[in-house]
Regions:
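Zn-dependent metallo-beta-lactamase
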Residues: 1-18, 25-28, 95-98, 102, ...
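Short gly/ser/thr-rich secondary-structure transition/capping motifs
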Residues: 1-5, 24-32, 84-85, 131-133, ...
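Pre-active-site segment of Zn-dependent metallo-hydrolases
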Residues: 10-50, 55-59, 73, 109-112, ...
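Active-site-proximal loop/helix segments of hydrolase catalytic cores
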Residues: 16, 108-172
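Active-site neighborhood of phospho(di)ester-bond hydrolases with catalytic His/Asp-centered motifs
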Residues: 21-22, 41-49, 68-72, 128-132, ...
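Active-site environment of divalent metal-dependent phosphoester hydrolases
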Residues: 27-28, 50-55, 75-78, 93-95, ...
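Glycine/small-residue-rich loop that forms an oxyanion/phosphate-binding "nest" at active or ligand-binding sites
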Residues: 47, 55-112
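Binuclear metal-ion centers of metallo-dependent hydrolases, dominated by the metallo-beta-lactamase
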Residues: 79-92, 167-218
Length: 218
């Protein structure tokens, strides 16, 4: 399974299915691609209705025929545009083409519907994308129920957890490997991933990627 960080919170997961999470590309100064270059996608996941997460999700779904998995209120909007959707809510699970997607708690705000994180099970791997969130004890449930092989955790502070809270989130979620996200896209979310890695220590393997770089999860 190949994991590519597209900048900000946008992730591409290439396995038996092609999955995009929070594909904010247009207007993203850190983006490593553009939506018009994406011609293959099976599932697009959106964690919440902020522009830097909902991003280009509708366009990608319309261009590729991908199924949009997201909170109910966004799903209703997308369905009205002819997009295939799987709407859900926190605590729920959907299965799309053999891929299990669980929606979990996030502490944040949103324009429409509630913010969320997601846990994705595919090809024998379990991935946790926290979305935009503060540190919350609910992350302990992610660890207890799912034991993620790889987690994507925001570290940019101000609008999400900063480095100290994200370090604790690694512990709570029992993450084996972590890719920091949602940092250094804009001046207001500047953070040092090296400092994050140092503070995590031997709790987990921290993988620092540049936008466009990939990591093979085995």
């Amino acid at each position: 399974m190949e994991i590519t960080w597209l900048g900000h919170s946008a992730i591409k997961i290439s396995g038996s299915k092609m999955i995009y999470i929070d594909p904010f590309l247009t207007g993203n100064p850190a983006a490593s691609t553009t939506p018009d270059k994406i011609d293959c996608a099976d599932i697009v996941v959106v964690t919440h209705d902020h522009g830097d997460h909902k991003g280009d999700s509708f366009q990608i779904c319309m261009n590729t025929g991908a199924t949009l998995v997201t909170i109910h209120e966004i799903a209703v909007e997308a369905q009205e545009k002819g997009i295939t959707v799987e709407g859900m809510n926190i605590g729920g699970t959907v299965t799309v083409d053999g891929v299990k997607i669980h929606m979990v708690q996030a502490i944040h705000s949103a324009e429409k519907g509630d913010p969320a994180g997601v846990v994705i099970e595919m090809d024998g791997q379990t991935l946790y994308h926290a979305g935009d969130t503060a540190l919350t004890y609910d992350m302990k449930l992610v660890g207890e129920f799912f034991h993620p092989d790889l987690s994507f955790l925001p570290i940019g502070d101000r609008y999400t957890m900063g480095v100290p809270s994200a370090v604790k989130a690694v512990e709570f979620s029992q993450s084996k490997k972590v890719i920091p996200i949602h940092y250094n896209t804009f001046p207001l979310v500047e953070a040092d991933p090296v400092e994050f890695k140092k503070r995590v220590g031997d709790q987990a393997e921290v993988i620092i990627l540049k936008p466009g770089e990939s990591y093979t999860l085995e």
